[in-house]
């Protein structure tokens, strides 16, 4: 990272030379810019958009006062991403770890991923089918090649499938059965932060 003397201009070398989307297209600095533009777009609902207001002119763009080209984020090259901030902030590097800074593809929103799996099939109200991303580096050998998320609206039906081993994960159990599941060591709780 290169930082200006006023701590307002940051140039990041995107160390993603070999990272590819699930369709084989290389990830570039422009994909990060596209993500920020989408989040700042006034028609995009976002609970985290205020965090982007540290970037020069981001709020003015969100308020439709200026074009996106005036916002302090740009791709200097395929591998260089520049941010210009309104003022120096010590926590800027931490903000970059938030999902609003993850890369996105304008031409294929929601259809490609850089993660270990991609959405192969979605049957509304029935299931999601995730498949191994063939371009994901270091995919664990023991990891499943496919993951199926079944949507089962009735809690009691889902519980029966779980008890008989036909479901590996149960995200919601009837309260009356919770103690039994806890005694068997089948309950794990992960608080949301």
Task: Locate predicted features.
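Gly/Pro-rich hinge or "lid" segments in bacterial periplasmic/extracellular proteins
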Residues: 64, 68-70, 78-79, 84-146, ...
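Short helices/loops that flank or line small-molecule/ion binding pockets
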Residues: 24-26, 31, 156-166, 183-184
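Extracytoplasmic/secreted envelope proteins and their assembly/folding machinery
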Residues: 29, 33-37, 70, 127, ...
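Sec-exported extracytoplasmic/periplasmic mature domains
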Residues: 37-45, 97, 135, 163, ...
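Local pocket/hinge segments that shape ligand/substrate recognition
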Residues: 141, 171-193
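Structural recognition of the beta-strand scaffold that forms the well-ordered cores
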Residues: 12-14, 129, 148-151, 168-172, ...
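Surface-exposed binding/hinge segments that line
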Residues: 11-15, 26-33, 38-104
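N-terminal lobe/hinge region of extracytoplasmic solute-binding protein
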Residues: 1-8, 15, 112
């Amino acid at each position: 990272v290169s930082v200006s003397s006023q701590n307002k201009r940051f140039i990041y070398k995107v160390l993603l030379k070999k990272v590819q989307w699930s369709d084989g297209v290389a990830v570039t600095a422009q994909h990060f810019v596209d993500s920020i533009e989408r989040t700042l777009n006034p028609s995009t609902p976002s609970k985290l958009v205020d965090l982007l207001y540290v970037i020069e002119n981001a709020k003015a763009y969100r308020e439709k006062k200026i074009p996106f080209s005036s916002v302090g984020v740009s791709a200097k090259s395929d591998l260089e991403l520049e941010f210009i901030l309104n003022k120096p902030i010590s926590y800027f590097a931490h903000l970059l770890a938030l999902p609003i800074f993850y890369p996105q593809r304008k031409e294929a929103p929601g259809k490609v991923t850089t993660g270990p799996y991609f959405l192969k099939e979605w049957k509304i109200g029935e299931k999601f089918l995730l498949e191994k991303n063939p371009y994901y580096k270091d995919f664990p050998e023991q990891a499943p090649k496919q993951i199926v998320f079944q949507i089962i609206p009735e809690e009691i039906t889902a519980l029966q499938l779980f008890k008989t081993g036909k479901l590996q994960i149960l995200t919601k159990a009837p309260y009356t059965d919770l103690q039994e599941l806890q005694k068997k060591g089948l309950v794990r709780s992960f608080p949301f932060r």
